[in-house]
Regions:
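Short linear motifs embedded in intrinsically disordered, charge-biased segments
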Residues: 2-5, 11-19, 24, 30-53, ...
Length: 351
């Protein structure tokens, strides 16, 4: 509701004269629907923000922040975090993740989110909302009104797949699947003799490669993931360069011909650069806390512990010849950290 929007803007201390300007932009707004038989009659638009307006994201985030501050105002909700604090939600615009150690707490936050959202004209999409239980316990479903939320083993959030078991392989397989589909759609280009090798490689690096390694900075590294990424990468390069297995071209020679590195080496460099950003954050930022945080509740299963991103980064630091504390100090100098990562990556590529 737009009237709710102006009231919320006022609570955030935005001067009345600016609110009046915002209001004037939305006054008497109308549109029509274009069909194959012509345009419909004009009708008024009384809700929502304007599409394409540079103010729209700002106004929408004001509303989301207003809702979330009231939905999770109870400081006892959420999961135990550092310094006696609790983490109850992670938000990216309207993509919201609610976190809780108890079923009751999660149901309460969901109810509050729905209640305050409806007051300003926003409703939770029951079809798009999923639940995930971390651990072996079973709980009744979370409800939104009369609708029961489905519990899933993994779900997609901000383009990445989150697994109940905390496995990276689910996301890696999904990224490779999407990249393979993209690569296949461009096969006429790869087969064309009229397009130079350099142009094909530029297309591969600007279209297929980013699809493959999207969010790879957050992946842990295992032998299986490394092999899966490199196999896909080499298969694509052999197709682009027209190299058959009958030609007996080694992987090392293939990389020299393509003037590229193994995909895993690219992922390692991206992860190290990303880690530098995290290490530079203030101590209270959730991303900074997450790389050193250990849950106080729960019990690990018997057997070998699963590898984590933290362990992967420690291996990166060992390869870079650094300890955690010295890495945090070095990362504060952005230029110095970038040069260090580039130097280690070039040395790894030669090896």
């Amino acid at each position: 509701h737009r009237e709710s929007l102006w009231k919320i803007a006022k609570t955030y201390g935005i001067p009345e004269k600016y609110i009046n300007i915002f209001r004037s932009l939305y006054r008497n707004s109308s549109c029509c629907v274009k069909t194959r038989h012509g345009n419909t009659i004009m009708f008024d638009i009384l809700t929502g923000v304007r599409q394409g307006c540079i103010l729209s994201p700002f106004l929408f985030l004001l509303v989301i922040d207003y809702i979330m501050k009231r939905a999770v105002k109870d400081r006892s909700l959420g999961v135990e975090w550092s310094g006696g604090n609790r983490l109850a939600d992670l938000d990216f615009a309207d993509d919201i993740a609610l976190l809780s150690c108890t079923h009751t707490g999660l149901q309460e936050m969901t109810n509050e989110l729905g209640k305050y959202g409806e007051k300003v004209g926003l409703r939770i999409s029951c079809e798009k909302t999923k639940g995930m239980i971390i651990g072996e316990h079973q709980y009744p479903p979370i409800t939104i009104g009369s609708h029961c939320i489905e519990y899933v083993e993994n779900f997609q959030y901000l383009g990445s797949y989150i697994s109940r078991a905390g496995e990276t392989e689910v996301d890696v397989r999904a990224r490779i699947g999407k990249a393979a589909a993209t690569f296949e759609r461009l096969r006429p280009i790869w087969r064309s003799g009229a397009i130079s090798k350099n142009l094909k490689m530029r297309l591969y690096q600007s279209i297929v490669l980013p699809t493959t390694i999207y969010a790879s900075e957050t992946w842990k590294q295992t032998a299986g993931i490394t092999n899966r990424l490199n196999v896909f990468h080499r298969r694509c390069l052999r197709t682009i360069l027209g190299i058959s297995w009958r030609d007996h071209v080694t992987n090392e020679k293939l990389m020299m011909m393509a003037e590229m590195r193994d995909l895993q080496d690219i992922v390692i460099e991206r992860r190290r650069r990303f880690a530098g950003h995290i290490l530079r954050l203030p101590e209270e930022r959730p991303a900074k806390v997450a790389i050193t945080w250990t849950p106080r509740m729960g019990r690990r299963k018997k057997g070998r512990p699963k590898k984590t991103w933290r362990q992967t980064f420690r291996e990166d630091l060992d390869e870079m010849g650094m300890a955690w504390n010295s890495a945090a100090e070095t990362a504060n100098d952005r230029v110095k950290w970038r040069k260090l990562v580039a130097r280690c990556s070039s040395r790894s590529g030669r090896n």
